[in-house]
């Protein structure tokens, strides 16, 4: 899509690592997944591994980048959110559905049962299709 920012996850991970360094935190968590790879090379595991190595070398400490969604389909990600139930008094599924944002065109005005966005970009289409599949399988 036109709004795709090449290498954005390199920027996010570098920024997070700099912030974490000053707090003596060595574990970073990212929501990247290879299901997003079609057109998004910075969502691949090989990229994340290279960033883990580069950040560790740049900061002279062992940094670990955890990507719990890496090998899940979008439907499985919705299922995971549902299965997590409540955390710290918050319904994880509802928090993901309402507060997370996937639309690459920044649309937050159109509400759908899968969250905010329009189906005019690949990211929203993947999210909506995953939601539909999870619903059809009775996971959510």
PLM regions and their residue ranges:
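Nucleotide-activated chemistry modules centered on ATP-dependent adenylation/adenylyltransferase
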Residues: 1-140
